[in-house]
């Protein structure tokens, strides 16, 4: 998979504050679902804002498809049609009177024709399953609907990379499942998705890769391997995912081969634990 967006040697400090990121190398690879994890204050939000152009590194550089980003109007426009960030609180992002007006804001600022803007808005509303809310005032939306509207505004820009800050936070289980299904659909249509989360179980289940932000830097690898690194999890202030713990127990009991992948969801765990009984045939009656 090719590198879409990358930070090279990037450092950043807020005014009159400590250095948040120092000499960081970080990349988003095309087609990979990436979970970004770390304790509060580890720099996740800063990293996401650097990747999306909301902040500029004090040193180092941001690259898109191998080319350094220029922070002039043309360069930032190119970046924002490649990378879109959706913040955690939708109320920090929504401002227009209605859902369709809010979703149309980004495309309108690209100077597109009215017909193209309408097409993008309709496409984004359909992707987030909120077409029926197009004319609804944003202040009358539920929290989950506001989340979906904020994501639709980013999707309407047709980015190649969609970065989401804690997108499942505050959603009930049904809302979480619906959102994850939507993200899977976006990935299937070619969008690379990055999700910041504190939920290690969600990261194990959903992500192809996981990046753990620790005081020693960003450590990225296949999710199942990265989230089994107890040393890195400890540095990142995270617990061991239940799926990793379950896999270790199954291997200790001889129920899972050492080279076989562990369960990433309850359904996979049920399948693994049912396999020995199935293999041995039906029980005597």
Stretch-by-stretch model annotation:
Residues 52:
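Helix-to-loop junction immediately C-terminal to a conserved catalytic motif
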Residues 211, 215-225:
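Conserved switch/coupling elements of ABC/ABC-like ATPase nucleotide-binding domains
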Residues 37-39:
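The feature captures the beta-strand-to-loop junction immediately N-terminal to the Walker
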Residues 137-141:
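Conserved ABC ATPase signature
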Residues 162-165:
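Catalytic Walker B motif of ABC-type/P-loop ATPase nucleotide-binding domains
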Residues 115-133:
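Conserved ABC ATPase "signature" region
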Residues 61-78:
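ABC ATPase NBD Q-loop/coupling interface
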Residues 154-155:
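ABC ATPase C-loop
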